[in-house]
Protein backbone atom coordinates (compact mmCIF):
# COMPACT_ATOMS: atom_id res chain seq x y z
CA UNK A 1 0.00 0.00 0.00
CA UNK A 2 3.04 2.29 0.20
CA UNK A 3 3.80 4.81 -2.55
CA UNK A 4 5.91 4.05 -5.60
CA UNK A 5 9.65 4.60 -5.47
CA UNK A 6 10.77 8.17 -6.29
CA UNK A 7 14.03 6.82 -7.74
CA UNK A 8 14.67 7.63 -11.41
CA UNK A 9 16.73 4.79 -12.82
CA UNK A 10 19.67 5.43 -15.11
CA UNK A 11 18.89 4.76 -18.77
CA UNK A 12 20.71 1.67 -19.99
CA UNK A 13 20.46 -0.58 -22.99
CA UNK A 14 18.85 -3.97 -22.45
CA UNK A 15 20.38 -7.41 -22.81
CA UNK A 16 18.99 -10.85 -21.97
CA UNK A 17 20.54 -13.46 -19.70
CA UNK A 18 18.55 -16.49 -20.73
CA UNK A 19 14.91 -15.42 -20.43
CA UNK A 20 15.72 -12.63 -17.94
CA UNK A 21 15.91 -9.08 -19.34
CA UNK A 22 18.65 -6.95 -17.79
CA UNK A 23 18.78 -3.19 -18.17
CA UNK A 24 16.37 -0.83 -19.88
CA UNK A 25 13.07 -0.78 -18.03
CA UNK A 26 13.43 -4.35 -16.74
CA UNK A 27 13.17 -5.01 -13.00
CA UNK A 28 16.49 -5.05 -11.18
CA UNK A 29 17.59 -8.70 -11.23
CA UNK A 30 18.72 -10.41 -8.03
CA UNK A 31 21.63 -12.78 -8.42
CA UNK A 32 23.67 -15.18 -6.30
CA UNK A 33 26.47 -17.68 -6.78
CA UNK A 34 26.82 -21.31 -5.83
CA UNK A 35 29.45 -22.27 -3.26
CA UNK A 36 29.38 -26.00 -3.93
CA UNK A 37 32.05 -27.93 -5.80
CA UNK A 38 30.90 -27.66 -9.42
CA UNK A 39 32.17 -31.20 -10.01
CA UNK A 40 29.52 -32.34 -7.52
CA UNK A 41 26.64 -32.08 -9.95
CA UNK A 42 23.91 -33.22 -7.55
CA UNK A 43 24.92 -30.80 -4.79
CA UNK A 44 25.22 -27.89 -7.22
CA UNK A 45 21.86 -28.61 -8.83
CA UNK A 46 20.25 -28.84 -5.39
CA UNK A 47 21.68 -25.48 -4.35
CA UNK A 48 20.63 -23.80 -7.60
CA UNK A 49 17.09 -25.04 -7.07
CA UNK A 50 17.13 -23.65 -3.52
CA UNK A 51 18.27 -20.29 -4.87
CA UNK A 52 15.58 -20.31 -7.54
CA UNK A 53 12.94 -21.15 -4.93
CA UNK A 54 14.16 -18.18 -2.87
CA UNK A 55 13.64 -15.89 -5.88
CA UNK A 56 17.01 -15.80 -7.65
CA UNK A 57 16.67 -14.46 -11.19
CA UNK A 58 20.19 -15.48 -12.22
CA UNK A 59 22.75 -17.83 -10.65
CA UNK A 60 26.50 -17.74 -11.24
CA UNK A 61 28.55 -20.94 -11.15
CA UNK A 62 32.33 -21.11 -10.89
CA UNK A 63 33.91 -23.14 -13.71
CA UNK A 64 37.63 -23.39 -12.87
CA UNK A 65 38.61 -26.40 -15.01
CA UNK A 66 37.62 -28.21 -18.18
CA UNK A 67 36.23 -31.04 -16.05
CA UNK A 68 34.08 -28.46 -14.27
CA UNK A 69 32.91 -27.25 -17.68
CA UNK A 70 31.65 -30.74 -18.51
CA UNK A 71 29.92 -30.89 -15.11
CA UNK A 72 28.42 -27.47 -15.85
CA UNK A 73 26.81 -28.92 -18.95
CA UNK A 74 25.11 -31.59 -16.85
CA UNK A 75 24.00 -28.99 -14.31
CA UNK A 76 22.57 -26.71 -16.99
CA UNK A 77 20.32 -29.46 -18.31
CA UNK A 78 18.73 -29.97 -14.88
CA UNK A 79 17.78 -26.39 -13.94
CA UNK A 80 15.62 -23.66 -15.44
CA UNK A 81 17.08 -20.48 -13.90
CA UNK A 82 19.63 -18.75 -16.19
CA UNK A 83 23.24 -19.63 -15.36
CA UNK A 84 26.34 -17.47 -15.64
CA UNK A 85 29.66 -19.30 -15.97
CA UNK A 86 32.42 -17.64 -13.95
CA UNK A 87 35.62 -17.96 -15.98
CA UNK A 88 39.16 -17.05 -14.94
CA UNK A 89 42.57 -17.65 -16.57
CA UNK A 90 41.65 -20.26 -19.21
CA UNK A 91 39.62 -18.79 -22.07
CA UNK A 92 39.09 -22.26 -23.56
CA UNK A 93 36.75 -23.06 -20.67
CA UNK A 94 34.55 -20.18 -21.84
CA UNK A 95 34.50 -21.61 -25.34
CA UNK A 96 33.40 -25.00 -24.01
CA UNK A 97 30.58 -23.77 -21.76
CA UNK A 98 29.32 -21.65 -24.65
CA UNK A 99 28.87 -24.88 -26.58
CA UNK A 100 27.10 -26.43 -23.57
CA UNK A 101 24.37 -23.79 -23.39
CA UNK A 102 25.54 -21.26 -20.79
CA UNK A 103 23.31 -18.16 -20.54
CA UNK A 104 26.10 -15.64 -19.85
CA UNK A 105 29.89 -15.63 -19.65
CA UNK A 106 31.63 -13.74 -16.86
CA UNK A 107 35.24 -12.98 -17.69
CA UNK A 108 37.79 -11.09 -15.61
CA UNK A 109 39.90 -8.74 -17.75
CA UNK A 110 42.71 -8.98 -15.21
CA UNK A 111 43.42 -12.63 -15.89
CA UNK A 112 41.73 -13.81 -19.09
CA UNK A 113 44.84 -13.10 -21.18
CA UNK A 114 45.73 -11.57 -24.53
CA UNK A 115 43.34 -9.78 -26.86
CA UNK A 116 43.22 -12.74 -29.23
CA UNK A 117 41.80 -14.83 -26.39
CA UNK A 118 39.15 -12.22 -25.67
CA UNK A 119 38.34 -12.19 -29.39
CA UNK A 120 37.84 -15.96 -29.33
CA UNK A 121 35.47 -15.66 -26.37
CA UNK A 122 33.53 -12.86 -28.10
CA UNK A 123 33.25 -14.88 -31.30
CA UNK A 124 31.84 -17.82 -29.32
CA UNK A 125 29.40 -15.57 -27.47
CA UNK A 126 28.22 -14.00 -30.71
CA UNK A 127 27.81 -17.38 -32.40
CA UNK A 128 25.72 -18.79 -29.55
CA UNK A 129 23.80 -15.60 -28.75
CA UNK A 130 25.30 -15.29 -25.26
CA UNK A 131 25.97 -12.02 -23.40
CA UNK A 132 29.21 -11.35 -21.57
CA UNK A 133 29.80 -9.76 -18.21
CA UNK A 134 33.04 -7.83 -17.91
CA UNK A 135 33.83 -8.38 -14.24
CA UNK A 136 36.54 -6.05 -12.94
CA UNK A 137 37.70 -6.66 -9.39
CA UNK A 138 40.02 -4.56 -7.23
CA UNK A 139 41.84 -7.70 -6.10
CA UNK A 140 42.83 -8.82 -9.59
CA UNK A 141 43.62 -5.74 -11.66
CA UNK A 142 45.99 -6.02 -14.60
CA UNK A 143 49.65 -5.73 -13.64
CA UNK A 144 50.24 -2.56 -15.65
CA UNK A 145 47.35 -0.84 -13.86
CA UNK A 146 48.67 -1.98 -10.49
CA UNK A 147 52.01 -0.43 -11.42
CA UNK A 148 50.44 2.76 -12.78
CA UNK A 149 48.20 3.48 -9.78
CA UNK A 150 50.26 1.80 -7.05
CA UNK A 151 47.12 0.40 -5.44
CA UNK A 152 43.52 -0.26 -6.42
CA UNK A 153 41.60 2.98 -6.99
CA UNK A 154 38.23 3.83 -8.55
CA UNK A 155 40.09 5.23 -11.55
CA UNK A 156 42.04 1.98 -11.97
CA UNK A 157 38.84 -0.07 -11.88
CA UNK A 158 37.19 2.15 -14.47
CA UNK A 159 40.26 2.19 -16.72
CA UNK A 160 40.34 -1.61 -16.66
CA UNK A 161 36.66 -1.76 -17.54
CA UNK A 162 36.92 0.84 -20.32
CA UNK A 163 39.92 -0.92 -21.82
CA UNK A 164 37.87 -4.04 -22.37
CA UNK A 165 34.68 -2.22 -23.26
CA UNK A 166 36.60 -0.50 -26.05
CA UNK A 167 37.92 -3.87 -27.16
CA UNK A 168 34.37 -5.22 -27.40
CA UNK A 169 33.37 -2.08 -29.29
CA UNK A 170 36.14 -2.71 -31.83
CA UNK A 171 34.78 -6.22 -32.24
CA UNK A 172 31.29 -4.75 -32.73
CA UNK A 173 29.93 -6.68 -29.73
CA UNK A 174 27.41 -4.79 -27.60
CA UNK A 175 25.68 -7.63 -25.75
CA UNK A 176 27.41 -7.19 -22.40
CA UNK A 177 27.10 -5.83 -18.88
CA UNK A 178 29.84 -4.54 -16.58
CA UNK A 179 30.82 -4.67 -12.91
CA UNK A 180 33.61 -2.83 -11.07
CA UNK A 181 33.71 -4.43 -7.64
CA UNK A 182 35.80 -3.71 -4.58
CA UNK A 183 35.58 -4.74 -0.95
CA UNK A 184 35.92 -1.07 0.03
CA UNK A 185 32.54 0.67 -0.12
CA UNK A 186 33.95 4.09 -1.03
CA UNK A 187 36.05 2.67 -3.86
CA UNK A 188 33.23 0.60 -5.34
CA UNK A 189 30.68 3.41 -5.17
CA UNK A 190 33.07 5.91 -6.75
CA UNK A 191 33.97 3.47 -9.54
CA UNK A 192 30.35 2.70 -10.37
CA UNK A 193 29.45 6.39 -10.39
CA UNK A 194 32.27 7.16 -12.81
CA UNK A 195 31.41 4.24 -15.06
CA UNK A 196 27.70 5.10 -15.12
CA UNK A 197 28.62 8.49 -16.60
CA UNK A 198 30.67 6.96 -19.40
CA UNK A 199 28.68 4.01 -20.75
CA UNK A 200 25.06 2.97 -21.26
CA UNK A 201 25.55 -0.76 -20.80
CA UNK A 202 23.76 -2.47 -17.89
CA UNK A 203 25.68 -2.43 -14.62
CA UNK A 204 25.91 -5.39 -12.25
CA UNK A 205 26.37 -4.10 -8.70
CA UNK A 206 28.24 -5.75 -5.87
CA UNK A 207 30.56 -5.12 -2.96
CA UNK A 208 32.97 -8.01 -3.36
CA UNK A 209 34.11 -10.09 -0.39
CA UNK A 210 31.79 -8.04 1.82
CA UNK A 211 32.07 -10.36 4.84
CA UNK A 212 29.83 -12.60 6.90
CA UNK A 213 26.05 -12.46 7.17
CA UNK A 214 25.88 -9.46 9.50
CA UNK A 215 28.85 -7.36 8.42
CA UNK A 216 28.42 -8.24 4.75
CA UNK A 217 24.76 -7.27 4.83
CA UNK A 218 25.61 -3.90 6.38
CA UNK A 219 28.46 -3.18 3.97
CA UNK A 220 26.46 -4.22 0.91
CA UNK A 221 23.39 -2.30 2.03
CA UNK A 222 25.40 0.91 2.36
CA UNK A 223 27.28 0.56 -0.93
CA UNK A 224 24.52 -0.86 -3.09
CA UNK A 225 21.90 1.28 -1.38
CA UNK A 226 23.76 4.49 -2.24
CA UNK A 227 24.04 3.49 -5.89
CA UNK A 228 20.48 2.20 -6.20
CA UNK A 229 19.10 5.41 -4.69
CA UNK A 230 20.94 7.29 -7.45
CA UNK A 231 19.30 5.08 -10.06
CA UNK A 232 22.48 3.13 -10.80
CA UNK A 233 22.28 -0.64 -11.15
CA UNK A 234 20.49 -3.23 -13.28
CA UNK A 235 21.43 -6.42 -11.42
CA UNK A 236 22.70 -6.93 -7.88
CA UNK A 237 24.54 -9.58 -5.95
CA UNK A 238 24.96 -9.33 -2.18
CA UNK A 239 28.22 -11.20 -1.56
CA UNK A 240 28.10 -12.93 1.82
CA UNK A 241 30.24 -15.57 3.51
CA UNK A 242 27.00 -17.38 4.34
CA UNK A 243 24.33 -19.60 2.81
CA UNK A 244 23.78 -18.16 -0.70
CA UNK A 245 20.03 -18.19 -0.08
CA UNK A 246 20.66 -15.39 2.42
CA UNK A 247 22.10 -13.30 -0.44
CA UNK A 248 18.79 -13.51 -2.26
CA UNK A 249 16.80 -12.61 0.85
CA UNK A 250 18.98 -9.60 1.62
CA UNK A 251 18.91 -8.51 -2.02
CA UNK A 252 15.13 -8.47 -2.13
CA UNK A 253 14.91 -6.76 1.26
CA UNK A 254 17.21 -4.07 -0.11
CA UNK A 255 15.06 -3.53 -3.20
CA UNK A 256 11.87 -3.61 -1.14
CA UNK A 257 13.26 -0.96 1.19
CA UNK A 258 13.87 1.32 -1.81
CA UNK A 259 10.51 0.37 -3.38
CA UNK A 260 12.35 -0.74 -6.49
CA UNK A 261 11.00 -4.27 -6.52
CA UNK A 262 8.71 -6.32 -4.33
CA UNK A 263 8.67 -10.06 -3.82
CA UNK A 264 7.26 -11.63 -0.70
CA UNK A 265 6.21 -9.92 2.47
CA UNK A 266 7.56 -6.53 3.46
CA UNK A 267 7.44 -6.61 7.25
CA UNK A 268 7.27 -3.41 9.27
CA UNK A 269 7.92 -4.20 12.93
CA UNK A 270 8.85 -2.24 16.02
CA UNK A 271 11.90 -3.25 18.10
CA UNK A 272 9.53 -3.62 21.10
CA UNK A 273 9.63 -2.00 24.54
CA UNK A 274 7.80 -2.28 27.85
CA UNK A 275 4.60 -0.96 26.22
CA UNK A 276 4.24 -4.05 24.03
CA UNK A 277 1.04 -6.04 24.51
CA UNK A 278 2.41 -9.18 22.87
CA UNK A 279 5.80 -10.73 22.17
CA UNK A 280 6.77 -8.70 19.11
CA UNK A 281 10.16 -10.33 18.51
CA UNK A 282 8.86 -13.88 18.94
CA UNK A 283 5.89 -13.13 16.70
CA UNK A 284 8.10 -11.65 13.99
CA UNK A 285 10.57 -14.54 14.06
CA UNK A 286 7.74 -17.05 13.76
CA UNK A 287 6.00 -15.18 10.94
CA UNK A 288 9.17 -14.73 8.91
CA UNK A 289 9.91 -18.45 9.16
CA UNK A 290 6.36 -19.61 8.44
CA UNK A 291 5.71 -17.22 5.56
CA UNK A 292 9.05 -17.63 3.81
CA UNK A 293 7.32 -19.42 0.92
CA UNK A 294 5.16 -16.44 -0.06
CA UNK A 295 6.34 -14.55 -3.15
CA UNK A 296 3.34 -12.24 -3.61
CA UNK A 297 4.18 -8.66 -2.52
CA UNK A 298 2.39 -7.69 0.69
CA UNK A 299 2.99 -5.06 3.38
CA UNK A 300 2.47 -6.39 6.92
CA UNK A 301 3.02 -4.26 10.03
CA UNK A 302 3.53 -5.80 13.46
CA UNK A 303 3.59 -3.11 16.16
CA UNK A 304 3.44 -3.85 19.87
CA UNK A 305 1.33 -0.92 21.12
CA UNK A 306 -0.98 1.92 20.10
CA UNK A 307 1.71 4.63 19.91
CA UNK A 308 2.67 3.92 16.28
CA UNK A 309 0.60 0.82 15.58
CA UNK A 310 -2.54 2.38 14.09
CA UNK A 311 -0.57 4.76 11.88
CA UNK A 312 1.57 1.96 10.41
CA UNK A 313 -1.44 -0.36 10.11
CA UNK A 314 -3.35 2.17 8.03
CA UNK A 315 -0.53 2.10 5.46
CA UNK A 316 -0.28 -1.72 5.35
CA UNK A 317 -2.20 -4.49 3.64
CA UNK A 318 -2.46 -6.14 7.05
CA UNK A 319 -1.50 -4.46 10.31
CA UNK A 320 -1.40 -5.74 13.87
CA UNK A 321 -1.49 -3.25 16.74
CA UNK A 322 -0.97 -4.39 20.32
CA UNK A 323 -3.88 -3.71 22.66
CA UNK A 324 -5.40 -4.76 25.96
CA UNK A 325 -7.35 -7.01 26.34
CA UNK A 326 -7.00 -7.88 22.63
CA UNK A 327 -4.83 -6.81 19.70
CA UNK A 328 -6.42 -4.95 16.81
CA UNK A 329 -6.03 -6.13 13.21
CA UNK A 330 -6.32 -3.72 10.30
CA UNK A 331 -6.95 -4.97 6.76
CA UNK A 332 -6.42 -2.55 3.88
CA UNK A 333 -5.98 0.23 6.40
CA UNK A 334 -9.26 -0.29 8.24
CA UNK A 335 -9.99 -1.96 11.61
CA UNK A 336 -11.20 -5.48 10.88
CA UNK A 337 -10.97 -7.80 13.90
CA UNK A 338 -9.32 -8.46 17.24
CA UNK A 339 -6.87 -11.22 18.14
CA UNK A 340 -5.89 -12.49 21.56
CA UNK A 341 -2.36 -13.60 22.38
CA UNK A 342 -3.24 -17.29 22.87
CA UNK A 343 -3.07 -18.19 19.16
CA UNK A 344 -1.77 -14.91 17.80
CA UNK A 345 0.78 -16.27 15.33
CA UNK A 346 -1.56 -18.97 13.99
CA UNK A 347 -4.43 -16.52 13.54
CA UNK A 348 -2.26 -13.83 11.98
CA UNK A 349 -0.66 -16.31 9.59
CA UNK A 350 -4.12 -17.43 8.46
CA UNK A 351 -5.20 -13.84 7.82
CA UNK A 352 -2.05 -13.11 5.84
CA UNK A 353 -2.43 -16.23 3.69
CA UNK A 354 -6.08 -15.36 3.04
CA UNK A 355 -4.99 -11.89 1.93
CA UNK A 356 -2.34 -13.36 -0.35
CA UNK A 357 -4.89 -15.67 -2.00
CA UNK A 358 -7.27 -12.74 -2.45
CA UNK A 359 -4.55 -10.62 -4.03
CA UNK A 360 -3.42 -13.43 -6.34
CA UNK A 361 -7.01 -14.07 -7.46
CA UNK A 362 -7.49 -10.37 -8.20
CA UNK A 363 -4.30 -10.31 -10.26
CA UNK A 364 -5.42 -13.39 -12.22
CA UNK A 365 -8.76 -11.72 -12.97
CA UNK A 366 -6.98 -8.58 -14.17
CA UNK A 367 -4.72 -10.59 -16.47
CA UNK A 368 -7.72 -12.53 -17.84
CA UNK A 369 -9.62 -9.31 -18.60
CA UNK A 370 -6.64 -7.80 -20.40
CA UNK A 371 -5.92 -10.94 -22.45
Curated annotation (Swiss-Prot):
Cofactor note as given: Binds 1 [4Fe-4S] cluster.
Cofactor: [4Fe-4S] cluster
Organism: Chromohalobacter salexigens (strain ATCC BAA-138 / DSM 3043 / CIP 106854 / NCIMB 13768 / 1H11)
Family as reported in the entry's similarity comment: Belongs to the IspG family.
Uppermost EC category: oxidoreductase
Name of the molecule in the record: 4-hydroxy-3-methylbut-2-en-1-yl diphosphate synthase (flavodoxin)
Reaction it catalyzes: (2E)-4-hydroxy-3-methylbut-2-enyl diphosphate + oxidized [flavodoxin] + H2O + 2 H(+) = 2-C-methyl-D-erythritol 2,4-cyclic diphosphate + reduced [flavodoxin]
Binding-site residues, [4Fe-4S] cluster: 270, 273, 305, 312
GO biological process, one term: isopentenyl diphosphate biosynthetic process, methylerythritol 4-phosphate pathway
Keywords: 4Fe-4S, Iron, Iron-sulfur, Isoprene biosynthesis, Metal-binding, Oxidoreductase
MF-aspect GO terms: 4 iron, 4 sulfur cluster binding; 4-hydroxy-3-methylbut-2-en-1-yl diphosphate synthase activity (ferredoxin); 4-hydroxy-3-methylbut-2-enyl-diphosphate synthase activity (flavodoxin); iron ion binding
Keyword Iron-sulfur: yes
The protein's annotated pathway: Isoprenoid biosynthesis; isopentenyl diphosphate biosynthesis via DXP pathway; isopentenyl diphosphate from 1-deoxy-D-xylulose 5-phosphate: step 5/6
Keyword Plastid among UniProt keywords: no
